[in-house]
Amino acid sequence: MKLVVVQFFIISLLLTSSFSVLSSADSSCGGKCNVRCSKAGQHEECLKYCNICCQKCNCVPSGTFGHKDECPCYRDMKNSKGGSKCP
């Protein structure tokens, strides 16, 4: 019985720590993407793709435009037509 309780406790700790890592990544992406998309004409679409790229690459270039060399993964993601996926 004690072994089951210990196993449950360890699994709970692991799950809790992984959720906190995911939520902190989401919150940092949200803030960076809000800055990145602040001057975009289609703000919601910009945020959608910026967050997708940020979650995959773990970075967002500074500023509202350009500076993609700061984040090669973000820069190199392409859409189905071969254009830049990330704003």
From Swiss-Prot:
Signal peptide: 1-25
Record carries keyword Glycoprotein: no
GO cellular component: extracellular region
Localization in the cell: Secreted
One example of a Gene Ontology biological process annotation: gibberellic acid mediated signaling pathway
Tissue specificity: Expressed in roots and developing seeds.
Keyword annotations of the record: Disulfide bond, Gibberellin signaling pathway, Secreted, Signal
Entry comment on modification after translation: Six disulfide bonds may be present.
The protein's name: Gibberellin-regulated protein 8
Protein source organism: Arabidopsis thaliana
Lineage: Eukaryota, Viridiplantae, Streptophyta, Embryophyta, Tracheophyta
